[in-house]
Each structure stands twice: as C-alpha cells, then as structure tokens.
Design a protein with these regions (language model features):
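Conserved, structured core segments of small domains
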Residues: 1-266
Length: 266
C-alpha cells in the first residue's frame, strides 16, 4: 500500500527544537527499509497560494485554503505493508514530536498497471529543471456544480508539457489517521488534520517556470471549478545539515511571504 504522510501543526503543536531533529536518522531508516518513494519539505504557510475558478474567473489568494490558516509543512510518500506499519513510520518522523503527521492512503485502482507507483522509479535521482510545487487538490462544498470532472485530459496535457511530475487521488478524509508523539507515547486518532469544510482529495507535484505558470496549470484543472487548488513551493534542505545552524539561518524567512503577490487574474 502507498501512503501520503503530511506534516502539519496539528491540534497540540510543540516548539520546534532543531537540536532534537533526527530527520537524517529517519531518512536513512526509511531508505534502508525500502519504504521511501519521495518527500519534500515545503515553504511556510505564508508562501501558499490558493487558486479557484468561479464564473469563468481565476481567483488567486495568498495563504492556505482553511480559515484557520492550517498548512502542510512537508510530505513523504511511502510504500509499506499496511496502516500499522505506516503509523509506525510516521511516529518516528520528528514532525510527530513537534507537530502532527497525517497518514492517508492513496486510491488503489483495479485497472492499474502491475508495478504502478505514485512516484516513478528513479524520480528522486532526476535533476531539478524548474521551480517545484506541491499542489493540493481540494473539494469545496461551495464550488461550482456541473461541468466536466474528467481529469484525464488535464493529466495528459500537463504530462506532455513536462510540468506534472507525478500525482494521485487520495482515499477520503474518513480514512485519514493522525499520528503524534507526546511524552514518549504515540497518540493515534482518526480523521484529517483540519476540520474545515474543504478537504484534500489528491495531490500533484509540479515543476514549472514560476508561480505564474503554476497558477495557470492549477486553474486549468477541472477541480479548480468544483473545488480549489493550493500551491506550496518545495523548500529543499540537506538532511545531514546542522539543524541548529539551519534554523538560525532560515529564521528571517519565517512569518513573511517570499512568493510574488498575485491578487486576481482572468
């Protein structure tokens, strides 16, 4: 089974202690076990951009999609035997101690080709050719009704342009599991990380020229009309880095937006 791990503030966020960040150890363990497909840290919530189409107009707003401004700070895609193993893997990630890790299974399609994976084999070794964004494909009860919900033409176009690197539909939020570690104990609860009426239905990982192109790609997705899309740039870092020094170096970037201000486009 393939699972998406999303790292969020959760309901009981703890102060981040870079001296206690064991991400290098976690990464080495998942690689050695052969369960890791790919993962990225993401820019802070201020750099998220929400895109939706209403009445033919592309509406672009800064920030995450929820009123509470909850955001996804990073993700990993893993393949393991079952949910219990996925929870065990998530519980060892440093985010489980400082915040929360959501475990959500990907859809399994009966007509999928044998050996199909969300992340293509060899992808992590490919060089970066542009700016990368995680795009959250979200359901919005206030979205437009009617219209085509066939995403395949969009997938074929974006794959052909080389801007969509991979993506897949997720199981519904009822199948989400929250994992936290507090006081050395693993705390597991059911449901998604946010109680907002909008919910994450799938993901796509994009590589584009800039935010303007990312918005254009997102707006072309059928779910931009029925729902909304959230674009957050990847924030790569070296897991072997001195995390205390990295946190000091990156501190000035927190709490402010580094992505361009866009407003409304048509």
């Amino acid at each position: 089974m393939e699972y998406l791990l999303m790292y969020t503030a959760g309901k009981d966020p703890q102060p981040y202690d870079p001296s206690d960040d064991n991400i290098a150890e976690w990464s080495a363990d998942t690689q050695a076990r052969g369960v890791s497909e790919y993962g990225e840290r993401l820019r802070p919530g201020e750099d998220a951009t929400t895109v939706k189409v209403r009445n033919g107009q592309v509406l672009v707003t800064e920030g995450p999609f929820t009123e509470a401004k909850e955001w996804v700070g990073g993700f990993d895609i893993i393949e393991c035997d079952n949910l219990d193993e996925a929870i065990e893997i998530a519980s060892k990630h440093p985010a489980a101690r400082f915040s929360s890790a959501e475990v959500r299974p990907f859809m399994v399609w009966p007509d999928a080709e044998p050996g199909h994976r969300v992340v293509p084999h060899g992808f992590p070794e490919q060089p970066t050719g542009g700016k990368r964004y995680l795009m959250l494909v979200c359901v919005d009860p206030n979205g437009e009704e009617g219209g085509s919900d066939d995403v395949e033409p969009w997938v074929q176009e974006m794959d052909g342009r080389g801007v969509r690197l991979f993506g897949e539909v997720l199981r519904p939020p009822e199948d989400a599991t929250q994992v936290m570690v507090r006081g050395g104990s693993v705390i597991v609860s059911d449901g998604p990380f946010t109680e907002a009426k909008q919910w994450i239905a799938g993901i796509d990982f994009l590589e584009v020229r800039d935010l303007e192109e990312a918005v254009e790609v997102a707006a072309a997705h059928p779910m931009a009309r029925a729902g909304l899309m959230v674009l957050t740039p990847a924030w790569p870092f070296d897991v072997e880095d001195d995390h205390v020094e990295r946190a000091r170096r990156e501190a000035p970037e927190l709490g402010r937006r580094s992505e361009p201000a866009l407003g409304v486009a048509s």
